[in-house]
Regions:
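Class I SAM-dependent transferase core
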Residues: 32-99, 103
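Conserved SAM-binding loop of SAM-dependent methyltransferases across substrates and taxa
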Residues: 111-123
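Conserved SAM/SAH-binding beta-strand->alpha-helix loop
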Residues: 133-134
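Conserved SAM-binding strand-loop segment of SAM-dependent methyltransferases
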Residues: 147-160
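A short acidic, Gly/Pro-enriched loop at the edge of an enzyme's catalytic core
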Residues: 162-171
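A short SAM/SAH-binding and catalytic strip from SAM-dependent methyltransferases
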Residues: 170-184
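A short glycine-rich, Lys/Arg-flanked "PGG" loop and its adjoining helix->strand segment in the class I
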Residues: 185-200
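Conserved class I S-adenosyl-L-methionine
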Residues: 202-225
């Protein structure tokens, strides 16, 4: 996962998990002051700063407060047995439209939970597992060696860039990670450059519209908010598959 403006160990002191259920907290306060984007930001990227909510960093993008993040000590949470029941990742992976030789980037790959499950679907392709935490990448390398998988490639990204060559990707996947990016505008711009024309973004986020999804508000997104942010970055909304238990499965095209 990507580390934002202030790193957070995603442990029980910051997010209480009981039988796979995450304790909810209050919604964020609105932003109160505009700030200039960094020099590397596209001209259209504007952030605001305000009071940070308990789970946020006090930085806002298109009115959404960016959440605190999951750190590498939470690998156990990413690899939990309940994930198949709660999120149906097998169903999500089967819904990816990937050619056998596709190159897909798993942005905020974390422990590689998705990357290693996508790997056999693209035997002549590659999964580029992008993360900015060296500890996550070390875990990925060790797991790849244990599994004998050679087409999952750990890749060190940056907080404001996927750090991949232009037009090098057929697709990109972001699973419960985008809402944590500390520089989402710059990340989307770099991803737009890295995707080939017609390349797809598969964006999975817990449904912010559904109060029954037991995830804290800042770690969820509505479809409307996701569309606002990605369409402003030049991506075309294609569809939102609705068969997953807790998550949106949104598809965008470059």
């Amino acid at each position: 996962m990507f580390i934002g403006a202030k790193p957070l160990l995603y442990i029980l002191s910051t997010i209480a998990v009981v039988s796979g259920i995450v304790v909810l907290r209050s919604s964020p306060k609105p932003p109160v002051s505009a700030i200039k984007p960094p020099a590397s930001a596209p001209a259209s990227v504007v952030y605001t700063h305000g009071s940070a909510s308990p789970d946020g960093i006090g930085k806002f993008f298109h009115g959404r407060e960016i959440s605190q993040v999951m750190g590498h000590p939470a690998i156990g949470w990413l690899e939990r047995d309940e994930r198949e029941r709660e999120e149906a990742p097998t169903k999500a992976i089967n819904a990816l439209q990937l050619a056998p030789d596709a190159v897909i980037a798993d942005i905020g790959a974390g422990s590689g939970y998705y990357a290693f499950r996508i790997s056999p679907k693209i035997p002549r392709g590659q999964v580029i597992a992008v993360d900015i935490q060296p500890e996550m990448l070390d875990f990925l390398k060790t797991r790849a060696a244990e599994l004998g998988i050679t087409n999952v490639v750990p890749h060190l990204g940056k907080i404001d860039s996927v750090a991949l060559p232009p037009a090098s990707l057929d697709a990109a996947l972001m699973v419960d990670a985008y809402h944590e990016f500390s520089h989402p505008g710059e990340m989307l711009a770099s991803l737009h450059r890295a995707l080939k024309p017609g390349g797809k973004i598969y964006l999975l986020e817990f449904r912010g519209e559904d109060p029954r999804v037991p995830i804290k508000p800042l770690h969820k997104m509505t479809e409307a908010q996701a569309r606002l942010e990605l369409e402003a970055a030049g991506f075309r909304f294609v569809s939102n598959r609705r068969e997953l238990p807790w998550q949106h499965f949104m598809v965008f095209e470059r």
